């Protein structure tokens, strides 16, 4: 009998979300755990497996599940391992696909979280019908899933498309990956918070943000201040969008995509981030690309796109 469901798991730096998905792309049920709560990988896998088993039981047990797909930072599709992910609590090489298979007795496939989001957009979202596009995930870090001629670009080792760790500012901010000046230290949600702290420390402008503990400021705090008209908060988003737009202008030159689709928590800022990104992308692109590349917001709920994309892997799971 054909198995009617697949599982999608999205592992982020803050939350891990998982869901049961049917063949039409409907998420039947889902759950989540806090990623950062678990400093030890075996404890994390145990709790994640318990949560996944609960939603499997709700649809009649593992006999109804075709496979499990996982999207994770630095996830390697070829090996099923998470390798040296700077925004996760566990370091080194983690054979996550095998660990989950051992606990759940269901085959597991794993890929980069941005690749999973790209699959979700191509199958169910803003990239339907497109063959050449890039999905940019803006969350704890910056990820990118590149699709060329309808195929995800993995590279020879599974790690193609690490836009977040290309250099935005020479000798700039220290990144968790060990490099300095990486794009994600400026243009992720955590990058926005870092910019806010720097501005508050080095400038004297009045700002609603000065009422907060600088070490606890989040990108949402900056957004809340900006929508109230706070000049400093608006400048923070302008700076963030400038760096991101300049990077996109370079990125476009490699694959000439039809569209760049923005996905993740930071896009909740809407025009505050979208407008400066578009402006600086267009200003810095080669003339042959100008006004040809669509800049789109994800059409899928933030939690849904990555879960749906990861679940697509579950339908075509391979053994490691």
What kind of region is each of these model predictions?
Residues 128-187:
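Glycine-rich phosphate-binding loop of actin/hexokinase-like ATP-binding domains
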Residues 1-67, 77-81, 98-106, 123-130, ...:
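ATP-binding/phosphotransfer module of carbohydrate and carboxylate kinases, centering on a glycine-rich
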Residues 10, 69-73, 111, 135-141, ...:
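Short beta-strand segments
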Residues 35-37, 90, 160-162:
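A short acidic/small-residue loop/turn micro-motif
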Residues 81-93:
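A charged helix-plus-loop insertion that forms the helical arch/lid used to bind
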Residues 111-125:
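Conserved PLP phosphate-binding loop immediately N-terminal to the Schiff-base lysine helix
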Residues 87-90, 109-115, 135-138, 296-304:
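Active-site nucleophile and cofactor-binding loops and adjacent substrate-binding regions
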Residues 31-33, 86, 156:
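Short hydrophobic alpha-helix segments
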